Every structure is written in C-alpha cells, then in structure tokens.
C-alpha cells in the first residue's frame, strides 16, 4: 500500500487544486501539507472533508492508494471452494497457522481466522470457537484502519460466525458510526448489505430478537436495490425465519418457502438446497 498522504497530494496536484482549496477552510494548510509529506495524520473527519474537496470518491482513492490490491481473500476463498470439505478446510487452517507461527505475517493469521469462521459456519457440529486473541486481533486490525476498503468490509463480513450476536452488533454499530460510513455505503453497498444480512442471520440463529430487530431496521434503512435480487431473496428467507422463531410460524414459513421457490426458479441450486436444509432443521427443532 502506498503512503496515503503522497497519493492524496498526487491527486490534488493533478487536478490543480491548491492546499488551501483542499482544506475547504476547515483546517490549516500546514496541517494538510505535513499529512502529504507523511509527517502527521489527519483525523478521519478532516481526511474525508479533504477528499470531498479534491472531488475523489473513497473507492477511487482506495484503488489509487493500493488499499485493496494485496488482498489475499480471493486466493483464500478459491482454495476453500476448490475442495469443500471439513478435512480440507482443517488442513488449510493448520497450514496458515503454521505459516503465521513461522513468519509472523498478519495475513496468515487473518487467513486462519477466516478459515475458522468458514468451518464454524458450514460445520456447526464441530467444537470450535474463536480465541480471545483472535477476536482482539480482528478488532484491533479493523478499527485501527483509517480508510476502509473492500478488504476490511469482506474481512468483517466473512468472520461473522466467530462473534456472538451482541459483539457483532457492537462492531456493526461502530461501523455505521464511522465518519466514512456514507462514503463506504456509496462505494461498497453490496459488501455493507452482506454485513447487515450476516448480522441478521447470526442474531436470528442465536434467538437474540432485539439484535435481530436492530439488523432488520438497518437493512430496511438501506434496502437492496432491484439489481440485488439475490440479496433481496436471502433477506426474504431471513425475515421468514425471524418471524417463525418469534412465534409467527404461518407467515414465517410462507416467506421462507417463497424465498426457496425464487432461488429454485433462478436456478440457484446450491443456495436453494442450502436453505431447504435449513428450513427442515428449523421445523424439526420446533
């Protein structure tokens, strides 16, 4: 990743915007100049004010700064999906754990955490839990990053099975209170919506109805656009499960069956089968 200040200066100068214009009159030119030279940081609020003044979106800046260029997540998920089995994921997990112990690269530790989340999400019968060290590492990593890009959003979304419902809600509240949240929503809406949907499912499966209502409201406040038909359908299933668990079984069951029918019509076979299995298990437990 390139120096953020240097990238900012490159964009500002290429657009013939002066230091004074870039501050928008909200802070001093000297403060911005020191930031560009890497001598000090800007507060998040001032950084995003300056970003708006140089007419640059968060996604554009993230791309130019290389914030997402070194993401190992696509490679990791490819390894995971190549041979989806508990044994394969456990072996991958051990290999990344060993690599971290040997080289102390944070990417290896994060990869092992993501794999643990995958194992927990796909194989709930396995006795496995996130350690306090892993949860602390995730929190420190995510909330010490000044500019979130697709990598941070993907990391938070993928690791949802590791958290309790209350903790995931707490972290989501911190996310939506970030000063860059509106910019994140504009540039990475699908990733944000996946975070909300994962939180909704997590709260529902934990029977934490207050948390589920919190995520339900978030989803409705930032509802999926029509071109996000898959997420709309999964949300329909989640809403049905929420109602079913709260005792409104008839309408809840109807919504879940509707969602599965839509997935089947769209030929989303794996997803349809996944939610059919989930529905059977839910009915058998009740």
Where are these regions (language model features)?
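A short, Lys/Arg-rich alpha-helix, primarily the initiator
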Residues: 1-14
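Amphipathic alpha-helical segments of tetratricopeptide repeats
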Residues: 97-101, 137-143, 176-183, 216-224, ...
């Amino acid at each position: 990743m390139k120096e953020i200040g240097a990238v900012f200066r490159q964009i500002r100068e290429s657009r013939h915007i002066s230091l004074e214009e870039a501050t928008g009159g909200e802070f001093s030119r000297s403060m911005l100049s020191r930031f560009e030279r890497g001598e000090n940081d800007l507060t998040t609020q001032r950084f995003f004010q300056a970003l708006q003044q140089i007419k640059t979106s968060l996604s554009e800046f993230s791309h130019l700064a290389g914030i997402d260029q070194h993401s190992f997540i696509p490679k990791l998920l490819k390894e995971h999906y190549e041979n989806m089995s508990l044994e394969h994921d456990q072996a991958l997990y051990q290999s990344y754990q060993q690599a971290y112990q040997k080289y102390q690269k944070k990417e290896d530790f994060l990869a092992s955490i993501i794999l643990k989340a995958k194992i927990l999400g796909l194989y709930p019968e396995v006795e496995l839990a996130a350690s306090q060290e892993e949860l602390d590492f995730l929190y420190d990593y995510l909330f010490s990053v000044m500019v979130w890009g697709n990598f941070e959003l993907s990391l938070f979304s993928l690791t949802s099975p590791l958290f309790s419902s209350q903790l995931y809600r707490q972290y989501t509240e911190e996310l939506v209170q970030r000063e860059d949240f509106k910019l994140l929503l504009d540039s990475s809406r699908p990733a944000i919506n996946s975070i909300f949907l994962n939180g909704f499912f997590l709260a529902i499966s934990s029977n934490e109805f207050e948390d589920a209502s919190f995520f339900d409201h978030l989803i409705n406040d930032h509802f999926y656009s029509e071109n996000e038909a898959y997420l709309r359908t999964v949300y329909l299933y989640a809403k049905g499960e929420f109602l079913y668990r709260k005792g409104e079984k008839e309408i809840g069951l109807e919504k879940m069956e509707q969602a599965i029918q839509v997935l089947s019509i769209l030929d989303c076979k794996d997803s349809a089968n996944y939610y059919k299995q989930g529905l059977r298990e839910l009915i058998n437990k009740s």
